[in-house]
Design a protein with these regions (language model features):
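Conserved short strand/loop->alpha-helix "switch" segment adjacent to the catalytic nucleotide/phosphoryl-transfer site
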Residues: 26-45
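Helical (often loop-to-helix) elements that flank the catalytic cores of nucleotide-handling enzymes
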Residues: 88, 341-354, 557-563, 567-568
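A short glycine-centered beta->alpha linker in the GHKL/HATPase_c
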Residues: 81-86
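Short adenine-binding "F-helix/F-box" segment of the Bergerat
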Residues: 87-88, 95
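C-terminal interaction appendages of subunits in large macromolecular complexes
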Residues: 388-407, 422-427, 438, 442-444, ...
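GHKL-family ATPase ATP-binding module
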Residues: 1-14, 21, 43-45, 53-55, ...
Length: 648
């Protein structure tokens, strides 16, 4: 970054105001997505985004995020500090403007930040409005300033409280428990996002510290820092997979004023894993930058395969999908004025970005293939293998989709369907084994609840070739029962959900280790082959009780050891032997009436909705738990063995 850019004035004049703050407390979901766990953590991201903007502009190197004992959060950076001088238009300190006016900040002034994070850009004022208390501290110009707020309203004017030998901003806030349904921060959710940000912004050091002690009195802290950026990100994502080539191809360039960074490599798996970002925002739905990358990859590799005569010898027809099997890639572009579209506003719509990424990737990949002929041939061999597997998978897919599930004749024989045909009302229970399946069929509401028993553990799709997945009888039954098919007009591999028959797909397995393993196998299948089901919020996990506790005429179901102990303390005076405790290891141990009343009745059951908080981290975790590479899984078990509950 040039010194001229560094000298850009950052003062009250840089702060532009777009609209007022009144509506945020009345309709918080409009501004942060929701008021549950996701929205709660979004507050932290909004504040961190301000610090990242300072880093992108070249002024910030360190960001500290602290979770305090009372579940308040502090975010501190060593940037320039938010301006505190008088704002002419608003007639108050610029700091107060930033903290109390929605869409106020330097990110709307092109001279201050060339690009800026924050998908909706609601800014720290939104965080202020949704906090019972917020304290803003600024170190700037050798002085320290402070202002406190309650529910978005300042308690006093910005005041100078001493000298400072550093610069930066520190924001501490307490989320409003009367607005959020969840107010306890989860360390791992924050850690995953901050890890991504460290990879996406090489050189920044982000320290996350949790001051809440666990039962043993221990606290947690992690430092996220990457010198090589996306190259290290791809190494991390692929650390649980067997590598096809030893290198990570790392492209870091600037085309026509748009910074483009791409890192990619190939592994021996059958999955395509592309993670894309625009201004640090995870573009889950892709967009023009991903389109440009795919076009460059296909064109460049196909040209190499043709020029080297490898395709001619293989005598197989390849398409774009074949080039991406076993690919892990991260794409990050910085766009001055991004246009987001799609269902969740996480799809980049800027047409010009496609050509920019295509040119950047095409040039760099061509050079790599020329300079690394051995690796180039290994990649093309993998592409040819993928093409042959695709042809085999197409034949298997045709068998799955030959009969229309809507006609009834094609439904699996073991499926006990419901009579209601409106998908919004209907639920499909995936149940472990015929025994539990029989109990569930007897206990269900036949109008809206369908039961599909699964025979034992389904195929581990993480290790299976695509055609083997579709040849699996249990997986074919899931496809057919759901009414979904593979392939849309836009994408031959995409899930076609036009005829989806149920809007709740509920995994219901035994409350033991085997049941958890089956849960994981089914979730791996959904994540790899039916991810849209999860993204639309259709996948749930049932929560059958662990215990039935009885004392005299008192009877209570318990879902946790803590609930069981509370029952023992209340009715058995703390003596477990004086209480009759039945441990349910299998669903088949319950009667149909018990299964209905505890696990299936919509009036009082507990369902856990499956959501993807961080796609890259979910990808890494499924690969680590279910993939071929044993070493990362052994390390995970060794590190987490103390947290395991052993069935006895």
């Amino acid at each position: 970054m040039s010194e001229q850019n560094k000298e850009t004035s950052y003062s009250a004049k840089s702060i532009q105001v777009l609209e007022g703050l009144e509506a945020v407390r009345k309709r918080p979901a409009m501004y942060i997505g929701d008021i549950s766990e996701r929205g709660l953590h979004h507050l932290v991201y909004e504040v961190v985004d301000n610090s990242i903007d300072e880093a992108l502009a070249g002024y910030c190197k360190n960001i500290l995020v602290d979770i305090w004992e009372d579940n308040s959060i502090s975010v501190e950076d060593d940037g320039r500090g938010i301006p505190v001088d008088f704002h002419e238009k608003e007639k108050k300190s610029a700091l107060e403007v930033v903290m109390t006016v929605l869409h106020a900040g330097g990110k709307f002034d092109k001279g201050t930040y060339k690009v800026s994070g924050g998908l909706h850009g609601v800014g720290v004022s939104c965080v202020n409005a949704l906090s019972t208390k917020l304290v803003a501290e600024v170190c700037r110009g050798g002085k320290r300033y402070i202002q406190e707020y309650s529910c978005g309203k300042p308690l006093y004017a910005v005041k100078e409280v001493g000298t400072a030998d550093k610069t930066g901003t520190k924001v501490t806030f307490h989320p409003d428990g009367s607005i959020f349904t969840e107010t306890v921060y989860k360390y791992d959710i924050l850690a995953n996002r901050l890890r991504d940000l460290a990879y996406l912004n090489a050189g920044i050091r982000i320290t996350l510290t949790d001051h809440r002690a666990d039962a043993e009195g221990n606290t947690r802290s992690d430092v996220f820092h990457s010198e090589r950026g996306l190259g290290e990100f791809v190494e991390y994502l692929d650390s649980t997979r067997e590598h096809l080539i030893p290198d990570v191809i790392h492209i870091n360039t600037d085309k026509y004023g748009t910074p483009v960074e791409v890192a990619m490599t190939y592994n021996t798996s059958y999955n395509e894993n592309i993670h894309s970002y625009v201004n640090n925002i995870n573009t889950i739905e892709g967009g023009t930058h991903v389109t440009g990358f795919r076009m460059a990859l296909t064109r460049t590799l196909k040209k190499y395969a043709e020029d080297s005569k490898m395709l001619e010898k293989a005598k197989v027809e390849i398409n774009g999908d074949d080039f991406r099997e076993g690919l892990t890639a991260v794409i990050s572009v910085k766009v001055a004025e991004p246009q987001f579209e799609g269902q969740t506003k996480t799809k980049l719509g800027n047409d010009e970005v496609s050509g920019i990424v295509q040119q950047a990737v095409g040039e760099a990949l061509t050079n790599y293939l020329e300079e690394h002929p051995k690796e180039a041939r290994m990649i093309v061999d993998k592409v040819i293998l993928a093409a042959r597997a695709r042809i085999a998978a197409r034949k298997a897919r045709d068998l799955v989709q030959r009969k229309s599930p809507m006609g009834g004749a094609g439904l699996p024989g073991k499926l006990a369907d419901c009579s209601d045909k409106n998908p919004e009302n209907c639920e499909l229970f995936l149940v472990e084994g015929d025994s539990a399946g029989g109990t569930a069929k007897q206990g269900r509401n036949r109008m809206t609840q369908a039961i599909l028993p699964l025979r034992g553990k389904i195929l581990n799709v993480e290790k299976a070739m695509p055609h083997k997945v579709l040849e699996s009888e249990e997986i074919k039954n899931i496809y057919t029962a759901l009414g979904v098919t593979i392939g849309t007009e836009d994408d031959a591999k995409a899930l076609n959900m036009e005829k989806l028959r149920y809007h709740k797909v509920i995994i219901m397995t035994d409350a033991d280790v085997d049941g958890s393993h089956i849960d994981t196998l089914i979730l791996t299948f959904f994540f790899r082959h039916m991810r849209e089901l999860i993204e639309k919020g259709y996948v749930y996990i049932a929560a059958p009780p662990l215990y039935l506790c009885k004392k005299g005429n008192v009877e209570e179901y318990c879902w946790t050891d803590q609930q069981k102990q509370a029952f023992v303390d209340k009715y058995g005076s703390g003596n477990e032997s004086s209480v009759n405790i039945q441990r349910y290891k299998g669903l088949g141990e319950m009667s149909a009436e018990q299964l209905w009343s505890t696990t299936m009745n919509p009036e009082n059951r507990t369902l856990r909705q499956v959501a993807i908080e961080n796609v890259a981290q979910a990808d890494y975790t499924f690969s680590m738990l279910m993939g071929d590479d044993v070493a990362p899984r052994r390390q995970f078990i060794e590190e987490n063995a103390t947290y395991a509950t052993i069935d006895t």
